[in-house]
Regions:
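Short, solvent-exposed amphipathic alpha-helical segments in soluble enzyme
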Residues: 1, 27-28, 72-75, 97-98, ...
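RNA substrate-binding interface of SAM-dependent RNA methyltransferases
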Residues: 1-61, 121-126
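Long, charge-patterned amphipathic alpha-helical coiled-coil/hairpin "stalk" segments used as oligomerization
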Residues: 63-102
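Terminal targeting/leader modules
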Residues: 145-149
């Protein structure tokens, strides 16, 4: 989801090593240069991102409503979106520049990520073309049309 909707990279825990091969194959087939970074502690990711001038945006159902903050987020040029699970350390809330809620009800972290990426980019990510793709889908009202590039 993050790759398809315009993210440049994703940080994952070591337990998710199998994702790397899958995403490398997706890059080869469908284009793009999406990066997967494994095993970097969350605190270091946030510290390094801040040092690079990124704004830290934590997606949580306990944050400020996305619709109230999205205009400000659109004005930021460098973002790190933090998506946690049910047991996010409290320090993440305090170290983030923004704590943003898609809704104040339980929901999927992936759904929140997709909605935030879509809203921040005003839907422009849906028009994105991926460079160096081996395959490309041609829109079709019925059936599947895939061409080799």
């Amino acid at each position: 989801v993050s790759r398809a909707l315009g993210a440049e990279s994703i940080f994952l825990g070591d337990a998710e090593k199998d994702v790397v091969g899958t995403l490398e194959e997706v890059n080869r087939t469908w284009g793009g240069d999406f990066q997967v970074i494994l095993g970097v502690p969350w605190r270091k990711v946030i510290q390094d991102s801040k040092a690079e001038g990124r704004n830290i945006v934590h997606l949580t159902m306990y944050g400020m409503p996305l619709q109230d903050e999205v205009a400000e987020l659109r004005g930021l040029s460098k973002l790190l979106l933090v998506v946690g699970g049910p047991k996010v350390p409290g320090k993440v809330y305090h170290e983030s520049d923004y704590n943003i809620a898609v809704t104040s009800q339980p929901h999927s972290e992936i759904a929140a990520l997709a909605i935030v990426l879509h809203e921040i980019q005003s839907g422009e990510e849906l028009k994105r073309a991926f460079e160096k793709s081996r395959l490309r889908i041609l829109p079709s009202p019925k059936g599947k049309r895939v061409v080799e590039t």
